[in-house]
């Protein structure tokens, strides 16, 4: 583009000179353009073509230079003067303004400029730009500001600042004036951020930006970066091109932005020009082919019209103007002024035309008068004219009624962009989405909700998935919002229908509806393996302490029964035969020896019968209370036994956030960008603060980019990672196969999901009313049941729990079999021991008897001994043996 301009600059004078150089109708015009002023130069060329007449032609001589370089400006001005130009159009800044005005006054060469107006009287300087001081002061009074910051660019001069300070002294305003004109370009971003942070400390939230477009854009970028573009801030852009800047990026932040506009796009003259301007080729006319034009370019175009009209008036007055013989050295000493320069100056000041900048008229000092400046405010639907300012009427407000926030008229012909995020079950791609188009590709809770909202509000909508896959958080360093919140703040979407949590920091930059779903932060862990029943799981229905007490009670009852049986005379009785005859012995017997007492207590406890029972009242009392005791214990045991044997229990390693914070074996984290992370970062509760300290410093990072990644990490970590997320999502995933996650503990907080719209959006109130209506109709609960439970894959208990809880496995009762086998083995062992013991004892007795027989031989004695042996050791006989 620069090369094209340089070639045009070199060729234009030659071409114009070849065509008109020998013609008396050719009027030489100089041009001093700063580098980078492509659009201004294109507007100048368009004006030259547009306003050329058959009477005369304006022939330009263009120099492209650094206007801040006084030496370059001097050389260019003198070069133009030596070429015999009739007038010079150009730009200046604070460093070159004195040089140019001095040459103009000395040489009587008129200088037409769209640069900032100068103070005082400067002959031969025609200023196309209207003075902004009056309009700015009126706007400050309209907003009733009494304390604000004033950021100015010293390149534009200090006249406006001086007028503001004079009014401040008179009206007792508190003004903080800051010069941003000398800020180093290499460090400008950092310095702008530091500047606004200092203003924040001073509670300065009203700021006037008296700068040109490029510097305003740089400042606005940093204002957005540090989050000072939200509700509560008010900025006035003190130049004449309110729509020239990139307002889209600050449009939805919530801050009030006001300014001034000299080019009225509603004017028919401007509309016709824009029609032609937008058809120009960008390559031939750099900066053209757009539907807008910078105010400096518009003033440049108007300047060509003013010069053309001035020379036309001179022709009508038959005043002959010629530079023949008058082209000389501007540095001559003494300087030789151009004699006819005064006539041209007078003609220029007498011009009165309608241009792109409105009514163009000058006073005797070459300054604009009788002009009108539009007052603008930035709304969510773009810049809006709220009034105008003129020298006669001063501040006039024409916008008396602001559009209602509930007004959705005009949306019928607009497709509302709905931003959302792929998150099950809120928004999911259909299985056959590749065969579908538009909104039909998606399904889920929020998809159904968006359809209901659109039906109630009466608009068409288009679902779009957020590009970065994030919900929305502000970067701690750059202060830039990402995710769905960022798309709303920066105007990429009209509404967000997603599981977006309502938080304070988000509420500062966007608007939320009433919550359509309530929830809280919860803990997700991998479902622990169901514990296999132990060998002695049949003991689980009663605590081990109870079993110990039962054993002691059993022993105690047996001992008491033994004692009362010994002391009670009614337990002693003589032994009787089966036919009723009493024994010949006078000795009484007692059946409740210590072993029989133990046997009786055991039989009663096991609910089995026993051959013996107490005869005495005291013994029966002991037996009765023992039977009552065993009745209650056995009934309680039986009631709990079924549940303990048929239900496989899961033992969770953690049950609450406190459990997580007290250990380091299980890692835990949150979504990397969202309200859950922000909750822990801002929390002052000791447990949550401790958890945040751990999460922030954990290596490897415990934060995940998406919820799906967090769930996958839980499933793959073998119980060594816990994921903190919203309870609704936790409950949904718990109902999805492979059914291996679970929610533990209660919610850590209470919050809600809301539908978000840009600050001040006309959709806000309508969406809010729609949510309330859907809630009253019960549709929100119906949608949740549909996507959470009706489509669940794990059942109420998870997995195949119904089949598993109804059947007993061998492992459940293995201990009983072990006891049975152990008891049988013990019985056999005891029997063997008894046999061996008795055999050994009888062998010894037989040996003693044999020895005695050898000493006293007697057949009768032998017969008696044999009988005794037979009676005591008839192991294999059929007769009963009583030992």
UniProtKB/Swiss-Prot annotation:
Q: Which residues bind L-glutamate?
A: 499, 501, 506, 675-676, 726
Region Required for interaction with IQSEC1, residue ranges? 867-877
Which domain of life does this protein belong to? Eukaryota
What the entry lists under PANTHER family is as follows: IONOTROPIC GLUTAMATE RECEPTOR
Protein known as: Glutamate receptor 2
Residues annotated as carrying Phosphotyrosine in the record are: 876
The residue ranges for the Cytoplasmic side of the membrane come to 565-591, 611-616, 834-883
User: Remarks, anything else?
Assistant: The postsynaptic actions of L-glutamate are mediated by a variety of receptors that are named according to their selective agonists. This receptor binds AMPA (quisqualate) > L-glutamate > kainate.
Role played: Ionotropic glutamate receptor that functions as a ligand-gated cation channel, gated by L-glutamate and glutamatergic agonists such as alpha-amino-3-hydroxy-5-methyl-4-isoxazolepropionic acid (AMPA), quisqualic acid, and kainic acid. L-glutamate acts as an excitatory neurotransmitter at many synapses in the central nervous system and plays an important role in fast excitatory synaptic transmission.
PTM Phosphoserine: list the residues.
683, 717, 860, 863, 880
* InterPro entries the record matches: ANF_lig-bd_rcpt, Glu/Gly-bd, Iono_Glu_rcpt_met, Ionotropic_Glu_rcpt, Iontro_rcpt_C, Peripla_BP_I
Q: Where is the signal peptide?
A: 1-24
Residues bearing glycans? 256, 370, 406, 413
Quaternary organization:
Homotetramer or heterotetramer of pore-forming glutamate receptor subunits. Tetramers may be formed by the dimerization of dimers. May interact with MPP4. Forms a ternary complex with GRIP1 and CSPG4. Interacts with ATAD1 in an ATP-dependent manner. ATAD1-catalyzed ATP hydrolysis disrupts binding to ATAD1 and to GRIP1 and leads to AMPAR complex disassembly. Interacts with GRIP1 and GRIP2. Interacts with NSF via its C-terminus. Isoform 1, but not isoform 3, interacts with PICK1. Interacts with CACNG2. Interacts with GRIA1 and SYNDIG1.
**Hey, which stretches end up on the Extracellular side?**
25-543, 638-812
């Amino acid at each position: 583009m620069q090369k094209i301009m340089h070639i045009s600059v070199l060729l234009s004078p030659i071409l114009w000179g070849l065509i008109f150089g020998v013609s008396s109708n050719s009027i030489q015009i100089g041009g001093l353009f700063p580098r980078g002023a492509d659009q201004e130069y294109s507007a100048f060329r368009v004006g030259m073509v547009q306003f050329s007449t058959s009477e005369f032609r304006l022939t330009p001589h263009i120099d492209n230079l650094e206007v801040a370089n006084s030496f370059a400006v001097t050389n260019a001005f003198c070069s133009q003067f030596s070429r015999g130009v009739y007038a010079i159009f150009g730009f200046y800044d604070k460093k070159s303004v004195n040089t140019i005005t001095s040459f103009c006054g000395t040489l009587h060469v008129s200088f037409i400029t769209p640069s900032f107006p100068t103070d005082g009287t400067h002959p031969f300087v025609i200023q196309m730009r209207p003075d902004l001081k009056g309009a700015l002061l009126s706007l400050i009074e309209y907003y009733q500001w009494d304390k604000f910051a004033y950021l100015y660019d010293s390149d534009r001069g200090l006249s406006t600042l001086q007028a503001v300070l004079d009014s401040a002294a008179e009206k007792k305003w508190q003004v903080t004036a800051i010069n941003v004109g000398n800020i180093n370009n290499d460090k400008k971003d950092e310095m702008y951020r530091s500047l606004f942070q200092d203003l924040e400390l001073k509670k300065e939230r009203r700021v006037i930006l008296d700068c040109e477009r490029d510097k305003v854009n740089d400042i606005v970028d940093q204002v957005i970066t540090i989050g000072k573009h939200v509700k509560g801030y008010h900025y006035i852009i003190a130049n004449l091109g309110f729509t020239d800047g990139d307002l889209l990026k600050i449009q939805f932040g919530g801050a009030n932005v006001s300014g001034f506009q000299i080019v009225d796009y509603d004017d028919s003259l401007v509309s016709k020009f824009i029609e032609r301007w937008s058809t120009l080729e960008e390559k031939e006319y750099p900066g053209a082919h757009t539907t807008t034009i910078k105010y400096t370019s518009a003033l440049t175009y108007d300047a060509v019209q003013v010069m053309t009209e001035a020379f036309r008036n001179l022709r009508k007055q038959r005043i002959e103007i010629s530079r023949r013989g008058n082209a000389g050295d501007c540095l001559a000493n003494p300087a030789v002024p151009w004699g006819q320069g005064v006539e041209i100056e007078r003609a220029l000041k007498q011009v009165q035309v309608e241009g792109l900048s409105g009514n163009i008229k000058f006073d005797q000092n070459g300054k604009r008068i009788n002009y009108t400046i539009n007052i603008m405010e930035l709304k969510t639907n773009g810049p809006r004219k709220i009034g105008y300012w003129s020298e006669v009427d001063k501040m006039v407000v024409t916008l008396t009624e602001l559009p209602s926030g509930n007004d959705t008229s005009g949306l019928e012909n607009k497709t509302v962009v709905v931003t959302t995020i792929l998150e099950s079950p809120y928004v999911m791609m259909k299985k056959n989405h590749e065969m579908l188009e538009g909104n039909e590709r998606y399904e889920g809770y929020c998809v159904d909700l968006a359809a209901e909202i659109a039906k109630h509000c009466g608009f068409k909508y288009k679902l779009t998935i957020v590009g970065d896959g994030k919900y929305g958080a502000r970067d701690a360093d750059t202060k830039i919002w990402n995710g769905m919140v960022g798309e709303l703040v920066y105007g990429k979407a009209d509404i967000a229908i997603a599981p977006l949590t309502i938080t304070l920091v988000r509420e500062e930059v966007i608007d939320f509806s009433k919550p359509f779903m309530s929830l809280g932060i919860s803990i997700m862990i991998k479902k622990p393996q169901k514990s296999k029943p132990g060998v002695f799981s049949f003991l689980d229905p009663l605590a081990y302490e109870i079993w110990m007490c039962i054993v002691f009670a059993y022993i105690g009852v047996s001992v008491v029964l033994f004692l009362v049986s010994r002391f009670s005379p009614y337990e002693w009785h003589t032994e009787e035969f089966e036919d009723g005859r009493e024994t010949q012995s006078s000795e009484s017997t007692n059946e409740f020896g210590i072993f029989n007492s133990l046997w009786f207590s055991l039989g009663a406890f096991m609910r089995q019968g026993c051959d013996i029972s107490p005869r005495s009242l005291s013994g029966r009392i002991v037996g009765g209370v023992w039977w009552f005791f065993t009745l209650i214990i056995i009934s309680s045991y039986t009631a709990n036994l079924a549940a303990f044997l048929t239900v496989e229990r899961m033992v969770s390693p953690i049950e609450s956030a406190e459990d997580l914070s007290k250990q380091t074996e299980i890692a835990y984290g949150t979504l990397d960008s969202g309200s859950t992370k922000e909750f822990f970062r801002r929390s002052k509760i000791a447990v949550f603060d401790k958890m945040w300290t751990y999460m922030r410093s954990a290596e490897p990072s415990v934060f995940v980019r998406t919820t799906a990644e967090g769930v996958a990490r839980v499933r793959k970590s073998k119980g060594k990672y816990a994921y903190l997320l919203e309870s609704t999502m936790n409950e949904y995933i718990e109902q999805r196969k492979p059914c291996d996650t679970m929610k533990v503990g209660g919610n850590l907080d209470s919050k809600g999901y809301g539908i978000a719209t840009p600050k001040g959006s006309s959709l806000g109130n309508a969406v809010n009313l729609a949510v309330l209506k859907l809630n009253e109709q019960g549709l929100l609960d119906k949608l949740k049941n549909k996507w959470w439970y009706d489509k669940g894959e794990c059942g109420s208990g998870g997995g195949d729990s119904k089949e598993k809880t109804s059947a007993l496995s061998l492992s459940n009762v293995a201990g009983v079999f072990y006891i049975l086998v152990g008891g049988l083995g013990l019985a056999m062992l005891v029997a063997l021991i008894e046999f061996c013991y008795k055999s050994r004892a009888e062998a010894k007795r037989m040996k003693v008897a044999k020895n005695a027989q050898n000493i006293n031989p007697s057949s009768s004695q032998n017969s008696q001994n044999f009988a005794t042996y037979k009676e005591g050791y008839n192991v294999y006989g059929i007769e009963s043996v009583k030992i």
